[in-house]
Amino acid sequence: MTISSKWCVCLPGSNPFGRGRLGRRQALQATGIGFVATLTSILLGAGSVAQAQPVAGSPPIVDGLSVRILADNHTDRYSVPVATPGMKIDRTGGTERPGVPPASTWRAEWGLSMFAESVLGDETKRVMIDFGYTAEALLGNMGFIGLDPATIDALVLSHGHTDHFGGLLGLLAASKGKLKPGLPLFVGGEDCFCSRQTLAGGDFGSLDRPGILAAGIKLMLAEAPAVAAGHAVVSGQIPKATKEMPLQATKEQTGLVGGLGCDPALEPASKNTGTYIPDDFQHEIATSYVVKDKGLVVLTSCSHRGVLNTIKQAQASTGVDKLHALIGGFHLVPPLSDDYVRQTVADIKALSPDYIVAAHCSGERFYDIARAEMPNRVVQANVGSRFSFGTRS
């Protein structure tokens, strides 16, 4: 008998399994993962789902780290390299390069993707964090610098927004047969797969779990802090530990339709309303590295749980308080007031970061205020820019 996950519609209060069949909750208790994801994985003989390896003892300390911006909203042909005492900035803005036709250039669009390369002793590891809005931009930018997907050791998805996972399926399709077997993709929990809408009610998509598993990817559920590729620390879910009031960006709905969406049995009862509700981004995660003699480098993609909360969770998950660099989107945009942004900048400044790299959704007001408050420490991310830290970056 052939079973297809597309037959299953699991919405709050429904039971598609029927009398005499394995109940949905029984299946979940037996496996610890979503039933549709399990069936898809088994039938395809491809990907799998597992709990991520928790951080045990001291976090890994890398000798060097470089972070390349693969997808972002901004590009600048005339950006120049910068060397500072603790951070080297490589800018690649022009299009006239040997072997690259003039038609090839960086593609900027709304979204974010970062590529982290770390060195620990004789070992180099490469982690891709988020995948931009479209595969066209992501793959174009990867091709522009000759980034080989076969070198990737782990994938991390910060949260379930299309401008962060939109390029993933295209990357997996274009890299078929090239990726390392069982390549892990870290997500912050079942909530990452929920269907989402914009505040105006527009469809904002949902992450294609069956498609990911069909590509042979190993889904790693990282609700708690976990180690990725032996070098990075994924934050786990981020508590709201400060007085921050981050913007509500989208709405979410539980339920499985055609294998897409999140399983209501793995969501709190308060979310199983059968309709779209305010998105709390419980699943959002950040990625951090501890760089030898420098401190913590925090990669926060959108900071929907609050940028200060994200930093605090990174510090808690690594046991390292010294903030060497903060990179990513901070979501300090309208309608947040200037006073709110100024207070957040002051709170970040109080943490004494050595460097801040503002990308994606950080906002112009944040950038202007932060540069005034912390001159020579705040820089703008551009597509293609690479930021390097440590002695062997």
Where do the protein language model's features map onto the residues?
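Divalent metal-coordination and catalytic microenvironments
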Residues: A116, D130, M142, H159, ...
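Zn-dependent metallo-beta-lactamase
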Residues: C10, G32-G45, A50-E123, V234-H283, ...
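Short acidic, glycine/serine/threonine-rich loops at helix termini
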Residues: P81, R196-A200, D338, A370
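Cap/insert and terminal regions of metallo-dependent hydrolase folds
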Residues: A154, H161-F165, P268-F387
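Short hydrophobic-aromatic micro-motifs
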Residues: I129, A228-Q237, V297-T300
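Pre-active-site segment of Zn-dependent metallo-hydrolases
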Residues: P102-W110, S118-A154, G170, G177, ...
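Active-site HxH/HxHxD metal-binding segment of metal-dependent hydrolases
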Residues: D153-A224, G236-P246, A346-D354
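N-terminal secretory signal peptides
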Residues: M1-L22, V36-S41
